[in-house]
């Protein structure tokens, strides 16, 4: 049985990842975001595009607007034997999305954003990639977030 879209923040993050991935593969912003949002939604049966949630649009727009600076931060935090070009499109997209939400999107606590992107990585990548993403992004969990969860 297929799990249907729930409109939760996790599902919206997953849709943001899907839209960003499609854009990396040459897709346009609005069609990629709309498709990712409507694809397995039960409401998609009515053939009318749904209004895209602000949270989804903010994530996709934010990553695209800050893509160059996100890539620079990722490059600086890779081991010297790695380059950003060597990363898979899935991993690169996950890192950008997670890093954006943790460092530039103040709506979500760092630890929540980290946990969410790791869960999405487990679904779309393998365990090695999820661990890699966790290792790189865990450097950006602020002390303020750590104090709240302890």
Curated annotation (Swiss-Prot):
Designated name of the protein: Transcription antitermination protein NusB
Job of this protein: Involved in transcription antitermination. Required for transcription of ribosomal RNA (rRNA) genes. Binds specifically to the boxA antiterminator sequence of the ribosomal RNA (rrn) operons.
Keywords linked to the UniProt accession: RNA-binding, Transcription, Transcription antitermination, Transcription regulation
HAMAP family: NusB (MF_00073)
Gene behind the chain: nusB
Taxonomy, superkingdom: Bacteria
Pfam families for the chain: NusB
GO molecular function annotation: RNA binding
Family as reported in the entry's similarity comment: Belongs to the NusB family.
An annotated GO BP: transcription antitermination
Organism field: Streptococcus equi subsp. equi (strain 4047)
GO cellular component terms given for this protein: cytosol
InterPro entries: NusB-like_sf (IPR035926), NusB_fam (IPR011605), NusB_RsmB_TIM44 (IPR006027)
